[in-house]
UniProtKB/Swiss-Prot annotation:
Stated name of the protein: 5-hydroxytryptamine receptor 2B
Family the entry assigns: Belongs to the G-protein coupled receptor 1 family.
Effect of residue 337 to A: Slightly decreases agonist binding
Sugar-modified residues: 30
Pfam families per the UniProt record, alphabetical: 7tm_1
Residue ranges, Cytoplasmic side: 80-90, 152-171, 240-324, 383-481
Domain characteristics, as noted in the entry: Ligands are bound in a hydrophobic pocket formed by the transmembrane helices.
GO MF terms held by the record: G protein-coupled serotonin receptor activity; G-protein alpha-subunit binding; Gq/11-coupled serotonin receptor activity; GTPase activator activity; neurotransmitter receptor activity; serotonin binding; serotonin receptor activity
Species lineage: Eukaryota, Metazoa, Chordata, Craniata, Vertebrata
Residues the record marks as site: Hydrophobic barrier that decreases the speed of ligand binding and dissociation: 209
Motif (DRY motif): 152-154
Length: 481
């Protein structure tokens, strides 16, 4: 009969680290005293305990792991497939989504296994330091991406012209590479030191960073991976708010402008003849007395151009809304990661504190930090209509964007050059197409001298969007409307 087996015989067939779990411990400690009539009662209690663990595991899978994997996959697909989303800033978001996706794929499931086995490592020993390394790496990379996005946005608002000049795809990839290298540098001490094992029971380990072996890493790693990015995010957030308030004031109090011919060498430069003069485009600038546009149709032109100031105000409003989103991300960042890193520091510095309680709190708070990997794509993308539309199509397995004729007409623009040779500029044709401007619509004012400029031929360039006076220096941002 099954009841005649001795405990020692049963234990010899079970690995040592599995015997330490509550499930086997309850069986082995009560096996000798079990009677046939008491088996259902004992087994019922064990089944209930394991059932509760399974319920918690299912809850974590449904509420945390699956949304993290699904949401970040949608972000990666959107940036990869949508042409409108393929610019430098969104490459940061895609890299952030990659880091968060890897947390959901490789870190969370194994962390869930450790919960099921009551902190005992259920996998081969060699995988323990590798998993801890990936845990620190991907979580740190997620935090570093948030910090980099915050700094990048502040620079784009404070110095728009300079930021646009260095905001290429190659530059974005360099920045992303630096973020990942910093994250690797912070996490690399974990596999180098390795996990200390018990000599008597080498298979009986808990795969956690202990104070005795990783005390210095836990302290300085927390400073580098969290508190330093936190300080940077706080400073850049308030600087961003200040810069937006200043620009909103400048736009609101800007005097009326007049339409003039103005040479702008920083926007369009001919690449065919090095010695040729820069093209001249019609722009808004009341501070210079260049030759004005023909008087014919002035009233119609000014009615059309009066909307440009409104678009400037609208752009400021959009940036303020984006900064509010940044504030939400900043708040969630504090809410989800502060408890873990504060407890981590306390565990190292406080010798009189209950180490068992702090370790238990760490196991809880780390899952709150994991939740941020699922929240990041929601906060950053659900406020963006292009992302929302893409997500809706991807969920229904439709991976092609549809563009209406009305939308295409709204995006078409006509830009008139005073220099007829400007129409042949390879630079302008290349970048015009990239910005949604049809080269077939280019017309030269030299051809239109004998004709009246129609109201439909208005120049849609707003150079007074973000104008700052810093001493004697004036900066103008040129943007397509």
């Amino acid at each position: 009969m099954a009841l005649s087996y001795r405990v020692s015989e049963l234990q010899s067939t079970i690995p040592e680290h599995i015997l330490q779990s509550t499930f086997v411990h309850v069986i082995s400690s009560n096996w000798s005293g079990l009677q046939t009539e008491s088996i259902p009662e004992e087994m019922k209690q064990i089944v209930e305990e394991q059932g509760n663990k399974l319920h918690w595991a299912a809850l974590l899978i449904l509420m945390v792991i699956i949304p993290t994997i699904g949401g970040n996959t949608l972000v990666i697909l959107a940036v990869s497939l949508e042409k409108k989303l393929q610019y430098a800033t969104n490459y940061f978001l895609m890299s952030l989504a990659v880091a968060d996706l890897l947390v959901g794929l490789f870190v969370m499931p194994i962390a869930l296994l450790t919960i099921m086995f009551e902190a005992m490592w259920p996998l081969p020993l060699v995988l323990c330091p590798a998993w801890l390394f990936l845990d620190v790496l991907f979580s740190t990379a997620s935090i570093m991406h948030l910090c980099a996005i915050s700094v990048d946005r502040y620079i784009a608002i404070k110095k728009p012209i300079q930021a646009n000049q260095y905001n290429s795809r190659a530059t974005a990839f360099i920045k992303i590479t630096v973020v990942w290298l910093i994250s690797i540098g912070i996490a690399i001490p974990v596999p180098i030191k390795g996990i200390e094992t018990d000599v008597d029971n080498p298979n009986n380990i808990t795969c956690v960073l202990t104070k005795e072996r990783f005390g210095d890493f836990m302290l300085f790693g927390s400073l580098a991976a969290f508190f330093t990015p936190l300080a940077i995010m706080i400073v850049t957030y308030f600087l961003t708010i200040h810069a937006l308030q200043k620009k909103a004031y400048l736009v609101k109090n800007k005097p009326p402008q007049r339409l003039t011919w103005l040479t702008v060498s920083t926007v369009f430069q001919r690449d065919e003849t090095p010695c040729s003069s820069p093209e001249k485009v019609a722009m808004l600038d009341g501070s210079r007395k260049d030759k004005a546009l023909p008087n014919s149709g002035d009233e119609t032109l000014m009615r059309r151009t009066s909307t440009i100031g409104k678009k400037s105000v609208q752009t400021i409003s959009n940036e303020q809304r984006a900064s509010k989103v940044l504030g939400i991300v900043f708040f969630l960042f504090l809410l989800m990661w502060c408890p873990f890193f504060i407890t981590n520091i306390t565990l190292v510095l406080c010798d009189s504190c209950n180490q068992t309680t702090l370790q238990m709190l760490l196991e809880i708070f780390v899952w709150i930090g994991y939740v941020s990997s699922g929240v990041n794509p929601l906060v950053y993308t659900l406020f963006n209509k292009t992302f929302r539309d893409a997500f809706g199509r991807y969920i229904t397995c439709n991976y092609r964007a549809t563009k209406s004729v009305k939308t295409l007409r709204k995006r078409s623009s006509k830009i008139y050059f005073r220099n007829p040779m400007a129409e042949n500029s390879k630079f302008f044709k290349k970048h015009g197409i990239r910005n949604g401007i049809n080269p077939a619509m280019y017309q030269s004012p030299m051809r239109l001298r004998s004709s009246t400029i129609q109201s439909s031929s208005i120049i849609l360039l707003d150079t007074l969007l973000l104008t700052e006076n810093e001493g004697d220096k004036t900066e103008e941002q040129v943007s397509y409307v």
